């Protein structure tokens, strides 16, 4: 059994008196990839913000965090006046490590773009910068909020494969929010299905695909059918 890295419990999270999350009990294991799958408004992004420490007003706890936690948002949120290199090292008040930034630029496939401004980048390239920025602090856990929803299908597949490579290379744990059943199954070791009103985890689906993953694997089709059945049973679709 992998080492438990983080325990997340949300008894209740409310906005303006309305309960948006309830009875969440989740543990993350070292090195695993977990997806939160569910409809809009079920509290997936709110749960991610709680794990990141961006939401403090809730009843519950986030325990046993070891090391840094980094966040990759749905939009890259790059500083338009900073270069790719500067955007990646932006959070380092002491002055960023140019060698480390250069390595990350190479790892995310942007060699030759260190001095480029965001306006010169495609959407997929900008999101590669955002992922590199998330990795800059050597996080133990990387949180991703629908990171590939704004790119085309072919770019999305390339970015998914890149994410798997980076997770393995850096031995990090990923917690990912997505609306895409195929993406959740392809990337994850576990898929957690969330229902809404209030948001809670209704189903847990172990994936069990071996690396390297193959989109043509018949197991993916069987898992998708199972996931869709569970989404129907939870009245999510």
Curated annotation (Swiss-Prot):
* Primary localization: membrane
Swiss-Prot/TrEMBL keywords: ATP-binding, Cell inner membrane, Cell membrane, Membrane, Nucleotide-binding, Translocase, Transport
Task: Please name the Gene3D superfamilies in this protein's record.
Answer: P-loop containing nucleotide triphosphate hydrolases
**One Pfam family this chain carries?**
ABC_tran
What EC number(s) does its UniProt record assign?
Answer: 7.6.2.14
Q: List the disulfide bonds.
A: none
Record has Isomerase as a keyword: no
* Enzyme class (EC, first level): translocase
Entries under InterPro entries matching the protein: AAA+_ATPase, ABC_transporter-like_ATP-bd, ABC_transporter-like_CS, ABC_transporter_ATP-bind, P-loop_NTPase
List the SUPFAM superfamilies hit by this protein, alphabetically.
P-loop containing nucleoside triphosphate hydrolases
What membrane topology was assigned to this protein in its record? Peripheral membrane protein
The residue ranges of the ABC transporter domain are: 5-221
Q: Which residues bind ATP?
A: 38-45
GO cellular component terms attached to this protein's record? plasma membrane
Question: Which reactions does this protein catalyse?
Answer: ATP + H2O + aliphatic sulfonate-[sulfonate-binding protein]Side 1 = ADP + phosphate + aliphatic sulfonateSide 2 + [sulfonate-binding protein]Side 1
Quaternary state and partners of this protein? Answer: The complex is composed of two ATP-binding proteins (SsuB), two transmembrane proteins (SsuC) and a solute-binding protein (SsuA).
Function field: Part of the ABC transporter complex SsuABC involved in aliphatic sulfonates import. Responsible for energy coupling to the transport system.
Family note: Belongs to the ABC transporter superfamily. Aliphatic sulfonates importer (TC 3.A.1.17.2) family.
Task: Report the protein name in the record.
Answer: Aliphatic sulfonates import ATP-binding protein SsuB 1
Source organism of the structure: Pseudomonas savastanoi pv. phaseolicola (strain 1448A / Race 6) (Pseudomonas syringae pv. phaseolicola (strain 1448A / Race 6))
């Amino acid at each position: 059994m992998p080492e438990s890295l983080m325990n997340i419990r949300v008894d209740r999270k409310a906005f303006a008196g309305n309960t948006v999350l309830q009875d969440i009990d989740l543990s993350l294991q070292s090195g695993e990839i977990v997806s939160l799958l569910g409809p809009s408004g079920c509290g997936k992004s709110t749960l991610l913000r709680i794990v990141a420490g961006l939401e403090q007003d809730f009843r519950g706890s986030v325990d046993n965090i070891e090391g840094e936690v980094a966040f990759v948002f749905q939009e890259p949120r790059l500083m338009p006046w900073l270069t790719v290199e500067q955007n990646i090292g932006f959070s380092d008040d002491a002055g960023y490590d140019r060698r480390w930034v250069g390595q990350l630029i190479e790892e995310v496939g942007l060699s030759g773009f260190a001095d480029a401004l965001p306006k010169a980048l495609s959407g997929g390239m900008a999101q590669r910068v955002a992922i590199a920025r998330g990795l800059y602090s050597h996080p133990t856990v990387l949180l991703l909020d629908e990171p590939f929803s704004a790119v085309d299908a072919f770019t999305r597949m390339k970015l998914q494969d890149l994410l798997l490579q980076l997770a393995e290379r850096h031995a990090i744990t990923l917690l990912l929010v997505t609306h895409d059943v195929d993406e959740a199954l392809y990337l994850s070791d576990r898929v957690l299905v969330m229902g809404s009103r209030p948001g809670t985890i209704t189903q847990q689906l172990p994936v069990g695909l071996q690396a390297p993953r193959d989109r043509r694997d018949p197991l993916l089709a069987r898992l998708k059918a199972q996931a869709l059945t569970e989404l129907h049973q939870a009245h999510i679709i």
